[in-house]
Amino acid sequence: MAIKRYFALNDNTITNAYMSDLSTLATGSNMGAADILEVFSIYGQTISASATSSAELSRVLIKFDVTGSGFDSIKSERTAGRIPSSGSVNFYLRLFNAQHARTVPVDYTLDIAPVQHHWQEGSGLDMDTYKDLTKDRNGSNWMSASNSPDRAWTTPGGDYLATYNYSQDFSTGLEHLEVDITPLVEGWIAGTLANYGVGIKLSACHEAYYSSSVWGFSGVKYVDGILLNTTGAQKSY
């Protein structure tokens, strides 16, 4: 069985984690040029005066060249007969665990969903103190899909479709991600779905718990970049 690899065209990590002062959320930070991608949830690193535990999240955006005009886009390769027709081939999203010295979480689920609209990769590198901001620069962040033109996410952390959703369970935290997303890619190739890539995040029950007194207001989903999540986890992943 022949296997062909396609490498990501754009990718970025977006986060609302605290900066080093533990009071400023890094919602404007960009990591589009970093050499790794991070998905995490940190619960209760700080506690507010109202005894509310903090909820810090990180998500991944990633896009592949599916319908571009280049000779090596997936659609171009199919037209040229270098990959099989629909129904005779499968497309897998594969990301590899980057080894490091830190303890990894166990027993969690990652969700994959198509991004709803265009976003910019950006050129940020700093994944420790989040100093690379998108102010006056191109790039997506936790609050915005792009800076020029300025386009805010409808919901902080990205806007995603409710269709073509996938997930993978992780038991040890050391596994690689490998998910069959064939129907989604075929939709991109056929043009029935615009290709803005996918977002990767922890499932809602594994992202950090957060509640607020504003929760009762109709339509409220977040407060100052923190997502309200009353079914979330009260531990970190």
What are these regions (language model features)?
Residues 1-237:
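Secreted, disulfide-rich extracellular signaling modules
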